[in-house]
Design a protein with these regions (language model features):
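Selected alpha-helical membrane-embedding segments in polytopic membrane proteins
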Residues: 50-205
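Short cysteine-rich clusters marking metal-coordination/redox-active sites
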Residues: 8-11, 22-25
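Short Cys/His-rich micro-motifs in 6-15 aa windows
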Residues: 26-36
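Short, contiguous pre-domain boundary segments
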Residues: 34-53
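Short metal-coordination and nucleic-acid-contact micro-motifs, chiefly zinc-binding Cys/His arrays
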Residues: 4, 18
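Hydrophobic alpha-helical transmembrane segments and adjacent short intramembrane/lumenal linkers
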Residues: 168, 172-304
């Protein structure tokens, strides 16, 4: 059965009828209404060199469409793991802030310094493990949703093949003479690096960790001092976790996951699969809202 094709008006490359942008020069072939919103507008500029990692992260915050447009051209340089690392370091700083808010009676400088480092490392490791598991679980479930809405995995297999490709084994028929047209994407010449690229969509949770750090630094006030010999810091910390401030922290995480993350994950999936923005956005929001309810809104700390 023949497959409908469409020709790019800018570079002349032929793309499948289901493509929304030319795979080589980036020219939009089909335009959805939602792409009139700046956050979702596809970038059609020529690409020459990748942005530095810090500029990628900045654009993920202020202009995610541009960020993922750049990342998609050289996906192996995606800052996804850096974002996970920075977010985990912020967890460590949160632990440091919590410890410094304790009033410890009769503690020496050596004791305080040792416990400060211990709290930082403990929260850093917890943040890394927790977020690693959470992010990859979300990537898995977002992929399932995108498979339902736009056939995400099938599109990736069609564009990039299955598994790792050895350099120089690309079939000539899959390449266009326009594949290097003004910095064209050469999407067929690199692996999908799906997880690395989709990790970037969790930048909002990293930003929210900064907000949580500020909120806890201002609003975390444990009741009474820690008297060494009468109570342990562990038991005191457990009691402090019941303070109302944690409801605010949990709500910030829930709102971010339900409202902000779906926008970035939609653009990441759209750029990877060259698919519909609108259809991916619907499933991403449904998944995000559902997960935020189960993971965050059902936490005991949210309701005291």
């Amino acid at each position: 059965m023949s497959v409908a094709m469409q020709r790019c008006p800018r570079c002349g490359n032929e793309s499948s009828g289901e493509s929304y942008a030319c795979s080589f020069c980036g020219k939009r072939l089909r335009i959805e209404r939602i792409e009139r919103i700046p956050f979702f507008r596809r970038i059609e500029e020529d690409w020459f060199n990748p942005y530095p990692w810090y500029l990628k992260i900045l654009y993920l915050i202020i202009n995610p469409a541009r960020a993922f447009w750049d990342i998609n051209h050289l996906r192996k340089k995606s800052p996804g793991m850096l974002i996970l690392l920075f977010s985990s370091l912020l967890y460590g700083l949160i632990g440091l802030v919590l410890f410094n808010r304790f009033r410890i009676s009769g503690a020496s400088i050596t004791f305080t310094s040792a416990y400060s480092i211990a709290f930082f490392l403990m929260f850093f490791l917890f943040g890394f493990i927790y977020q690693f598991l959470l992010f990859y679980f979300l990537i898995w479930i977002y992929t399932k949703g995108a498979n339902y809405s736009v056939g995400f995995t099938q599109r990736l297999e069609k564009r990039f093949g299955i598994g790792r490709q050895k350099q120089g084994t690309i079939e000539e028929k899959k390449l266009s003479p326009f594949s290097i047209y003004k910095g064209g994407t050469l999407l067929q010449k690199q692996e999908a690096f799906k997880s690395k690229m989709m990790l970037c969509a969790f930048t909002p949770l990293m930003i929210m960790n900064i907000v949580k750090l500020i909120v806890l630094a201002i609003g975390f006030n444990p009741r009474g001092p820690v008297v060494l010999g009468e109570s342990t810091i562990d038991s005191f910390l457990a009691a402090s976790m019941k303070l109302p401030i944690w409801s605010v922290v949990d709500a910030l995480d829930a709102i971010t996951l339900a409202a902000w993350v779906p926008i970035l994950i939609t653009i990441a999936i759209r750029e990877l699969s060259n698919s519909s923005t609108y259809r991916v956005l619907i499933t991403s929001y449904l998944i995000s809202i559902t997960v935020s309810i189960f993971i965050f809104f059902l936490r005991p700390t949210l309701f005291g």
